[in-house]
Structure formats: structure tokens, C-alpha cells
């Protein structure tokens, strides 16, 4: 499979709705993005897709009361916004999407995100498949934003650390980029109060 074909396949997979949401978005990223280059290829471009395939997961799963939403902004990007509360042992809000099957991104060096920040630090979160099963732990890499500025952050695969329920995973297993199933954004680390992150595009780079 050549590079362009593999990227189109990856884009189609990450554009597939979770089974609970409905059927596949058939035409998402079916052609190479006009801004793609030999060194960077688009996985998700919110200027030409919706947020229907994404789901919110906040600290309510452990008794917290943080709130968040993900919606499309009129200017053509996804807006992840809400309020983080530290009450009831909470302290995080997240949004994520999952492919129908693992995506092989091993020919690239890492992920690139184009975001509109608010001065807070966010986490790009990945989950992978190992031995045919989804790992219990996730892989996380952080990026510190500048308030009111569009910026692009490149996160090498080596920047991602394995984490389970906020703790480092024993043995520090390396990220396996040839079997990525889930990807998402999170705000955590005791950053209480309102937050606002615009997401324009997610790419892979070499």
C-alpha cells in the first residue's frame, strides 16, 4: 500500500462513526488534502467533517462534576469547551473518537495538531491494540497553548507515555503506532475552571 493510499484509509477509519452513533461517513478524506505534503498528511480536518463521531468522557465516571462539550464553530473548526472541577476527586474532561479497526501509522514519526489555545495545557491521548485486544492504559503527550493564538504542535511518538488512571504504567511499554484505535483530547493536571480549545486539524508527519 503506498503512502497516499494508506493515509486515505487512515482518514476513512477515523471518520467512521462509533457503532452507537450510526453508519460510516463514506466520503471523509476520500481525496488527498490540498495542503498535504510529502512530509505531512491529514488524518482529520474539521473544516470538512462533523464532530458526530466523537464522544465526551469526563470525570463523572469517577464521581466528579466537570463538564464539557464538543461542537462545530461557525468558522470551520471543532470547539472543545467546558469547566473542570476538582470536587469529588474529579479533575478532568475529555473527548475521543475510535476507529472501526486499528490504524497503522508506523511509517510516520508522530502526530501534528493545529489548535486555537486558551493558555492552558492539553493532552493528546491515544489507545492502541496489543495482541488483538485494546490496551487498558492510554498513551499521553502534553502541549501548552497560548491564549488566543492558532499554533501547530508536533508530538513525536516518543513523546507519548503510557498512563493508567493518572499513573505511569510499570515497565513503560512503548507506543505501538501500527495499531492505533482511539484518539482524543483531554484537560487534566488540576487545571480547574473554564477552558476553551479550538481544533482545526490532526495530521501525521515524517
Each predicted region: which residue ranges?
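Beta-rich carbohydrate-recognition modules and glycan-binding surfaces
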Residues: 2, 6, 19-206
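Bacterial N-terminal signal peptides
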Residues: 9-19
Amino acid at each position: 500500500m503506498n503512502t497516499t493510499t494508506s493515509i486515505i484509509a487512515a482518514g476513512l477509519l477515523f471518520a467512521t462513526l462509533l457503532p452507537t452513533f450510526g453508519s460510516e461517513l463514506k466520503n471523509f478524506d476520500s481525496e488527498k488534502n490540498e495542503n498535504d505534503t510529502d512530509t505531512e498528511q491529514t488524518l482529520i480536518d474539521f473544516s470538512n467533517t462533523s464532530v458526530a463521531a466523537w464522544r465526551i468522557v469526563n470525570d463523572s465516571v469517577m464521581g466528579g462534576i466537570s463538564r464539557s462539550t464538543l461542537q462545530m464553530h461557525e468558522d470551520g473548526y471543532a470547539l472543545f469547551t467546558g469547566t473542570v472541577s476538582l470536587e469529588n476527586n474529579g479533575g478532568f474532561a475529555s473527548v475521543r473518537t475510535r476507529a472501526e479497526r486499528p490504524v497503522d501509522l508506523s511509517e510516520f514519526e508522530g502526530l501534528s495538531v493545529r489548535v486555537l489555545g486558551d493558555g492552558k495545557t492539553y493532552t493528546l491521548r491515544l489507545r492502541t491494540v496489543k495482541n488483538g485486544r485494546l490496551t487498558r492504559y492510554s498513551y499521553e503527550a502534553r502541549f501548552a497553548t497560548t491564549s488566543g493564538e492558532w499554533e501547530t504542535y508536533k508530538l513525536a511518538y516518543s513523546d507519548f507515555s503510557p498512563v493508567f488512571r493518572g499513573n505511569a504504567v510499570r515497565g513503560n511499554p512503548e507506543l505501538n503506532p501500527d495499531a492505533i484505535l482511539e484518539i482524543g483530547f483531554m484537560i487534566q493536571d488540576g487545571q480547574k475552571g473554564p477552558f476553551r480549545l479550538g481544533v482545526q486539524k490532526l495530521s501525521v508527519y515524517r
